[in-house]
Amino acid sequence: MKKKHRIKKNDEFQTVFQKGKSNANRQFVVYQLDKAEQPYFRIGLSVSKKIGNAVVRNRIKRMIRQSITELKDEIDSGKDFVIIARKPCAEMTYEEVKKSLIHVFKRSGMKRIKK
């Protein structure tokens, strides 16, 4: 993912948390905030220390980033997303992570995701 597609600063995370809408399934919580003036989407990732050690947390983040990269043409532009991973992610394969992300994005009202 390119740097312009990432949310890194704490105040940007807090804005999405406070003003955005949330949707969830057992594996992920996704907050989304509409930003009409922004021509692209941005993603912020959060994986708690409760999930596992650094190796496990980084593996989960890599799988989420790869899933987003594959789905980037179907994700609505002009939005900020914060994805929070929950404990069941630690034992999931890449295919399961991608399928779960598609499910939670569909629940959040994205019409373009078809997979």
Swiss-Prot record:
BP GO terms, sorted: tRNA 5'-leader removal
Catalytic activity of the protein: Endonucleolytic cleavage of RNA, removing 5'-extranucleotides from tRNA precursor
Alphabetized GO MF terms: 3'-tRNA processing endoribonuclease activity; ribonuclease P activity; tRNA binding
GO terms under cellular component: ribonuclease P complex
Keywords: Endonuclease, Hydrolase, Nuclease, RNA-binding, tRNA processing
Family: Belongs to the RnpA family.
Function: RNaseP catalyzes the removal of the 5'-leader sequence from pre-tRNA to produce the mature 5'-terminus. It can also cleave other RNA substrates such as 4.5S RNA. The protein component plays an auxiliary but essential role in vivo by binding to the 5'-leader sequence and broadening the substrate specificity of the ribozyme.
PANTHER family: RIBONUCLEASE P PROTEIN COMPONENT (PTHR33992:SF1)
Protein name: Ribonuclease P protein component
Organism: Bacillus cereus (strain 03BB102)
Gene symbol of the encoding locus: rnpA
